[in-house]
Amino acid sequence: MTIWVDADACPVVVREILFRAARRTGEPLVLVANQSIATPSVPNISMLQVPQGYDAADDEIARRVVAGDLVITQDIPLAKEVIDKDALALSPRGELFTRANIVARLNMRDFLETMRSSGVHTGGPSALSQSDNQAFAKQLDKWLAKR
């Protein structure tokens, strides 16, 4: 099983948590981004650079992910594709996307996108907090424990 990271927008603190976990467990960890991101010199950690372009990293992850893999992403449509392939999707805030919650998340995303395109300022997400980091690490450890 592989941990895939939608790394273009992944917070540094989350990447560091992932690096520590990959070192500890030996699980394959692949960061996918359209820019080069430094990774530790560890055999099971790699960086896959994709061409510049809208959703290029998302498309590459969706193409490569298989059942049982874990994908770290904030991108709701990518999370839906991952779930449809029987893999797991986890946000950097520690929210596990599931078949039970992904449709509601997609609907909310689409609604907010419609609001923004009509000129309504919806604001963005709050800064990542220590409790978000802990929630992420806890969910990651749960997945790793099942290996």
Curated annotation (Swiss-Prot):
PANTHER family given in the database record: UPF0178 PROTEIN YAII
Domain of life: Bacteria
Species name: Teredinibacter turnerae (strain ATCC 39867 / T7901)
The protein's name in its UniProt record: UPF0178 protein TERTU_3490
NCBIfam families the record matches: PRK00124.1
Protein family according to the UniProt entry: Belongs to the UPF0178 family.
CDD domains: PIN_YqxD-like
Pfam families in the cross-refs: DUF188 (PF02639)
